[in-house]
Amino acid sequence: MTESASSTSGQEFDVFSVMDWKDGVGTLPGSDLKFRVNEFGALEVITDENEMENVKKATATTTWMVPTAQEAPTSPPSSRPVFPPAYWTSPPGCPTVFSEKTGMPFRLKDPVKVEGLQFCENCCQYGNVDECLSGGNYCSQNCARHIKDKDQKEERDVEEDNEEEDPKCSRKKKPKLSLKADTKEDGEERDDEMENKQDVRILRGSQRARRKRRGDSAVLKQGLPPKGKKAWCWASYLEEEKAVAVPAKLFKEHQSFPYNKNGFKVGMKLEGVDPEHQSVYCVLTVAEVCGYRIKLHFDGYSDCYDFWVNADALDIHPVGWCEKTGHKLHPPKGYKEEEFNWQTYLKTCKAQAAPKSLFENQNITVIPSGFRVGMKLEAVDKKNPSFICVATVTDMVDNRFLVHFDNWDESYDYWCEASSPHIHPVGWCKEHRRTLITPPGYPNVKHFSWDKYLEETNSLPAPARAFKVKPPHGFQKKMKLEVVDKRNPMFIRVATVADTDDHRVKVHFDGWNNCYDYWIDADSPDIHPVGWCSKTGHPLQPPLSPLELMEASEHGGCSTPGCKGIGHFKRARHLGPHSAANCPYSEINLNKDRIFPDRLSGEMPPASPSFPRNKRTDANESSSSPEIRDQHADDVKEDFEERTESEMRTSHEARGAREEPTVQQAQRRSAVFLSFKSPIPCLPLRWEQQSKLLPTVAGIPASKVSKWSTDEVSEFIQSLPGCEEHGKVFKDEQIDGEAFLLMTQTDIVKIMSIKLGPALKIFNSILMFKAAEKNSHNEL
């Protein structure tokens, strides 16, 4: 009896009701923290005395009620009786109390009796007696019906929960429908039967949807507290840590609380910027929706390139935007640019274009700027922040412009505003005694002159007045906030400001090792104020406890402390990490970029993590800034040689420890079990043996394989000796060339359920494709 009573009371616990509220300001007994309720109906810590005074002034002019965590109307506004403002509230001494779990108002057993007013058990409000139902406890027929429907829904929810907790019971028991045979006419009874049948259809539909979303829900439940433990709360956490949240006023509009809900739906089509090639606009599809964030998929490409953005991101646009503004749209894979048509494509895909009203950037007020397309400037290379290079403005949209580095490919381009700290006027490097990286191939690097270069390129410098100074961000050390985890972008975690500089902050994820800290721009859309997740409906990952760090490997199958087995360093989201080599949080992957082939060119990044990802340093090595780059290149080369020598030595020692019966068997085993970590081109004997064992693979580069369709991958698998029957498996799983190159031996054996022998041949063919790609680059 005691347990049931406590559980019942726990269900109806409301954090708002335990606070002391006065003039719109709530205080927690035993605490000095003060709270207010913002426009979203959620709690917000008051950190400024002026802010508290504003709350009191605003409350003095309105009739205030105790708020709810999720303000949801119990019935449509049109169904409620329209009372004068003075009556549409709770009388003094009887505030409206809402459930924190459901967001619905509790039924008050003993409402305050007020002469001339009738209390409604559904609305928990008071209205004129004349306008309420005669002799009833409801203000309207809709309110009475709502209470009845709510009771039935609660019964069904209880039965569904029981079925999910005990699958065996779900096979034995069928959901019961409460059919109340009151004294009604035959017509009313038939109406009830129809309503009950409709409820059954809705119930079955929700069960199917639940099964379909099981994968995502399992991930989202990671943030839910275990049974018997209290739910994590920002207010309690701040008090325990004696910490303060970053004031909401320090966040930019695109970081702060949104004004509208996220209206995007899965399957909607739109146009947007490729974050890895920011000069390229692509056809995108909404793959997932979570709170105020959406996950976007490049049509026709592997889902390993999917990326998350906020619903109000400036880089997404409605269908037809590129055609309207004169921008080039990159069509889906397999479509020709001149043949692509949005209307035809939407009909073919049976898809819906995202409504224009969902795009917040359609109503931006454009501020006059001194920048024009073609103007020159000096800009920081974000991929190598120590480099400041010669750059050009190549595009302008609203209040932003695209920075392109002269004579480099577009993968280094980025969008920025006039106040960006990454851009400087012509001559800034000379004035501040910084080295300016000149365009590759430019003659007379040591005597580079801006005047001469501007004349040669027939261009103008961006005027100094066009560059705006960004004010200090105001973030301070030890302040708390919510940050998107760049290593696993589906997660937003509780974080602390570990350090600051002029325009960046170093974030630390609470409970995690300091090695995961990283710097991020203070105006990045991936940082948010405390409470952003709760207000937008996005799961927030609470700080890791020492116990969770110990138990992580048991639950997630990954040995990395803190990792719950979600996310993958080398491929798409649905393949969880099976080892430290694949875990985005493992030590070996800590400072690496994800190993994906370039989406447009199909080229793989350098195999060795010692080499910088970009080509600019190597290409410009002999032409500009020799003091900086030559030293950097020597360090890289020395590190690479040490790693290679160590790996080769380890490989030879391992081979020497095992003696095979015959030379032929030794050659065969070495060819089959060769690891891609060893530089294959440096071992001609091994390369020769692999080519003999897999003749259909020799000479095919990975860039060509990445463009294969699912049918071509299937045909290739069938061409391998002993793998004829496995081609259909790859076709059924819709594995194209890009996905094929990202597979590991473990994936082929465990996920594809292919025996070890054929799996080794398939995996070695992948290694040979990559080696052939590397050979072709070396020859060039």
Curated annotation (Swiss-Prot):
One of its GO terms (biological process) is erythrocyte maturation. The keyword Repeat applies. MBT repeats lie at residues 232-332, 340-439, 448-543. A zinc finger (CCHHC-type) spans 549-593. The modification Phosphoserine is found at residue 608. Coiled coil: none annotated. One of its GO terms (molecular function) is identical protein binding. Residues 708-772 form the SAM domain. It is found in: Nucleus. One of its GO terms (cellular component) is nucleolus. Is a negative regulator of Notch target genes expression, required for RBPJ-mediated transcriptional repression. It recruits KDM1A to Notch-responsive elements and promotes KDM1A-mediated H3K4me demethylation. Involved in the regulation of ubiquitin-dependent degradation of a set of methylated non-histone proteins, including SOX2, DNMT1 and E2F1. It acts as an adapter recruiting the CRL4-DCAF5 E3 ubiquitin ligase complex to methylated target proteins. Required for normal maturation of myeloid progenitor cells. Interacts with RNF2. Interacts (via SAM domain) with SAMD1 (via SAM domain); the interaction mediates L3MBTL3 binding to chromatin. Interacts with RBPJ; the interaction is required for L3MBTL3 localization to chromatin and is impaired by Notch-derived peptides containing the intracellular domain (NICD). Interacts (via SAM domain) with KDM1A. Interacts with DCAF5. Interacts with DNMT1. Interacts with E2F1. Interacts with SOX2. Interacts with SFMBT1. This is Lethal(3)malignant brain tumor-like protein 3.
